UniProtKB/Swiss-Prot annotation:
Listed GO CC annotations: cytoplasm
Organism: Polynucleobacter necessarius subsp. necessarius (strain STIR1)
Name recorded for this polypeptide: Phosphate acyltransferase
Biological pathway: Lipid metabolism; phospholipid metabolism
Matching NCBIfam families: plsX
Organism classification: Bacteria, Pseudomonadati, Pseudomonadota, Betaproteobacteria, Burkholderiales
InterPro entries associated with the record: FA_synthesis, Phospholipid_synth_PlsX-like
Reaction catalysed by this enzyme: a fatty acyl-[ACP] + phosphate = an acyl phosphate + holo-[ACP]
Amino acid sequence: MSVTLAIDAMGGDHGVVVTVSAACDFLEKHADVKIALVGDPDLIKQVLSKSPKAPMERIQIILASEVVLMDDPIEVALRRKKDSSMRVAIEQVKEGAADAVISSGNTGALMAISRYILKTLEGVDRPAIATAIPNELGRGTTMLDLGANADCEPMHLVQFAQMANVMVQVVDGEQNPSIGLLNIGEEVIKGNEVVKQTSELLRQTSLNFYGNVEGNDIFRGTTDIVVCDGFVGNVVLKASEGLAKMMSGLIREEFNRSLLTKLMAVCAIVPLLRVRKRVDHRRYNGAVLLGLRGCVIKSHGSADRFAFGFALDRAYEAAKNRMVERIAAAFVVETKV
């Protein structure tokens, strides 16, 4: 099965320098992939000219005259910039010309435009943002929602769990993923009313519901999936990113303190590199916008060429394994339970 990916080539902090270069790398590894690069043709061609091995027969350049900036209000991105690279890329999925779209652009705008153009799956009240967070087991804990829905009702959280359950099966190959509900304690008596009601509803489904989990369980890998509302999820995500940057800076500072500590760093380089690889956030790049009638992947705005490649990987696996169709089918089954 051939897979076509539409890329918002202008999105993110680095634009075409990252997106187009990463696309060329990806095409070299996947002979069954075609890519549509959406944006300024002149800028796109400049980068392509530096990649002589790029299989041009599998690359399509689509003109888009506008760009959604990272600080653009959602209203501007949605109503005024109707020829933005982000919007035109999403329209490729809507029209069936692409199987998935990837953008490093403004998250709020991406969700709003995707929801406006693609619409939500039947029965889905609200789309959610899901991504993997590094854990000590060496694989990611899938967490959602990460900011799309600050306030949620119990049934919204149940729907998030249902959609993530299929996504983890499709993208990560975990056939019966365990699901945890983020709470202030494992006991069923703890938490607010929304969490308590959600827990009860999840126990009534056919999902592999583990029960309540705490914040530290995310990084332990206690469950494959952790569900929470978007307010809590975004706080957890930003806090974990901040902690990782702080620890990295402190370690670098300590090893550069003196000649002796620099020598110690040389001696410890192998285990340090192993640890860095296991927690490298770039390897977990590519959040999925779940609940839409199309596959939409959000890459981190600051993603480099290496990180953007992982977002393309995620889009490829989701599209190849028909994630959206399988979520729609499984969702209907679960909602009948």
